[in-house]
Amino acid sequence: VFSLKSEKSFGVGDFGDLRRMIDWAVITHQKVIQILPVNDTTMTHAWTDSYPYNSISIYAFHPMYADIKQMGTLKDKEAASKFNKKQKELNSLPAIDYEAVNQTKWEFFNLLFRQEGKKVLASKGFKDFFEANKEWLQPYAVFSYLRDAYKTPNFRKWPRHSVYNAEDIEKMCQPETVDYPHISLYYYIQYHLHLQLLSATEYARQHGVVLKGDIPIGISRNSVEAWTEPHYFNLNGQAGAPPDDFSINGQNWGFPTYNWDVMEKDGYRWWMKRFQKMAEYFDAYRIDHI
């Protein structure tokens, strides 16, 4: 999606550009658009986070893909003018400036959240989204908040909450806590991303185009899932591929392997939930590398 940058983008292709890609597919008589993973890969806020196969969540989308024009308009005219100028600057670059794009979009998210956040979080649409996605959304939001607070995605190094405790996390997420404004910002962004990708999906279906997603077979060892569900993984192992014509030394992807015996005991619930979530947005998907 990042490569779909258009004149309406903010320095990088976004979910709004997907609709323009669908229009092109219709004009050129194409039936399927396959995209790379669009999950959040934010580890350090550096350009090294741009690798789409090392996500911090199997559910959350990367905030970078939010079409800020769909999100809303800033009432502060001076701030709005500043972002319009920045959009033109970032769009004029010959290559995507990953760090600048993300930093600028986050500045926008914070301002718009202060302006619109309470109203959106009180809406029926958001409440329905939250209840349907709370199981993954709440841990993801807290993980992201603590990652930035402790300046590392390696939860083992966090001075507090290094071992996931659902009750403690639930307490942090109560609206009266000092943590809540920081945590709920992630709810707000994920809600907008959900609406935007769902809109693109419905648009594709209306035009007879299949959106095909991509599921990385592995998870990051510094991810929400490794933090909240370590029993599903062999965190002392590393997945990869043996030598072949493309890599004479083989490949070490660094991802932990799955504990299939544990997964089998609950009927592969972890995978079922993952596939069901993907099916909300995609009519087909690839499991890479299977």
Tell what function each PLM region has.
Residues V32, G208-K212, A284-R286:
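Structural preference for beta-strand elements that scaffold enzyme active sites
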Residues D17-T41, K277-A284:
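Catalytic domains of carbohydrate-active enzymes, especially glycoside hydrolases
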Residues V1-K5, F10:
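An acidic-aromatic substrate-binding cleft motif
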Residues F10-G13, W24:
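N-terminal ordered "arm"
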Residues L193-Q206, V210:
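Active-site pocket-lining segments that scaffold enzyme catalytic pockets across diverse folds
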Residues F2, V38-D40, P216-S220, I290:
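Active-site beta-loop-alpha junctions enriched in small/polar residues
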Residues A25, I35, F143, A204, ...:
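Conserved, mostly hydrophobic/aromatic
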Residues E7, H45-L195, G218-I290:
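Alpha-amylase-like alpha-glycosidases and glucanotransferases acting on alpha-linked glucans and related
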